[in-house]
Regions:
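Soluble or luminal CAZymes and related metallo-dependent hydrolases
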Residues: 1, 39, 81, 160, ...
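Short, low-complexity N-terminal intrinsically disordered segments enriched in polar/charged residues
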Residues: 1-19, 23, 107-178, 182, ...
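Hydrophobic alpha-helical core bundles mediating ligand binding, dimerization, or RNAP-core interactions
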Residues: 2, 21, 44, 70, ...
Length: 284
């Protein structure tokens, strides 16, 4: 499964990955859900046509009980700088049941084409029409009495890992920003959407504060949690609902976070989301 996804981008091998998808298989990308290979192929062809076949710079692969995570850094032939794609995959060793693919479109938009014939210096990805969605408002009376799931509620985790991830989740669900000091190692490495550069945990705090200024009445909610005990690495798919202040509309940002834990502290974190797909979905 992993090699089939890698070969799709590095060899333009559409046949192999198509054979892994059933009609009921879901491939989610750019906030759009494709059912089966016939609907997914246009997504793959658009990427290959716009950016070309890629060279694999690096890959990171982790396994949980039901899900696998694949992180790729690719160097497309038509672009000057590498791009990052992250996948959360569910399969039965024969067929793929679902794939959640997060393309860092902000990194693409900040990229440039290599060919002099191209007049466009900004790489604007060709995006499909997003899935229709209605984001409910936050009920201030119901919210305090509602059960709010934590990572350990939806994934079997070692005790110390559960405590670390639950405390991390409080940063986003409860705005407990003091946990940045207690949950992260002092020299923790952070990679955020829009950049391949490693940053400090201060960049993550600044990201949280920037989101708080852009979105009000926020609510963070878990989708899936996967844990690889061999790598001590967790992958969390989650959403952040909020009112986009500039237009006073409710939006939902889909986020994929990969966390590595060392000695009960977070030593590295990759936080990815599709910025341009969000802008298109809600006309921001």
């Amino acid at each position: 499964m992993i090699n089939a996804i890698i070969d799709l981008y590095t060899k333009a091998d559409i046949k192999t990955i198509s054979s892994k998808l059933l009609r009921s298989s879901r491939w989610q990308q750019h906030h759009f859900t494709a059912m089966g290979s016939l609907q997914a192929q246009p997504l793959w062809l658009d990427f290959l046509a716009q950016y070309g076949v890629s060279e694999l710079i690096s890959k990171t692969h982790s396994k949980g009980q039901e899900l696998e995570t694949l992180q790729l850094i690719l160097q497309p032939k038509k672009l000057l700088k590498p791009v990052r794609l992250s996948f959360v995959i569910k399969h039965n060793n024969t067929f793929i049941k679902s794939v959640k693919c997060v393309v860092d479109t902000l990194l693409l938009a900040n990229n440039e084409f290599t060919g002099e014939a191209s007049n466009n210096t900004l790489v604007i990805p060709k995006l499909p029409k997003s899935d229709p969605i209605m984001v409910c408002d936050l009920d201030n009376q119901l919210h305090p009495t509602t059960f709010h799931a934590t990572p350990s509620d939806i994934c079997e985790l070692p005790t110390q890992t559960a405590e670390t991830l639950n405390n991390w989740w409080q940063i986003w669900q409860l705005n407990n920003l003091a946990n940045f000091e207690s949950v992260y190692a002092k020299n923790a490495d952070v990679i955020l959407a829009g950049s391949n550069e490693t940053q400090s945990k201060d960049a993550l705090l600044n990201c949280h504060l920037a989101l708080s200024q852009t979105l009000s009445r926020c609510y963070a909610q878990l989708e899936t949690v996967q844990f690889d005990s061999a790598l001590n690495q967790a992958t969390i798919c989650w959403t952040l609902d909020g009112t986009f202040n500039a237009k006073n509309i409710r939006v939902r940002q889909q986020i994929l976070t990969v966390i590595t834990i060392t000695n009960t502290l977070i030593s590295s974190e990759v936080m990815q989301f599709d910025t341009l797909a969000l802008n298109q979905q809600f006309a921001l």
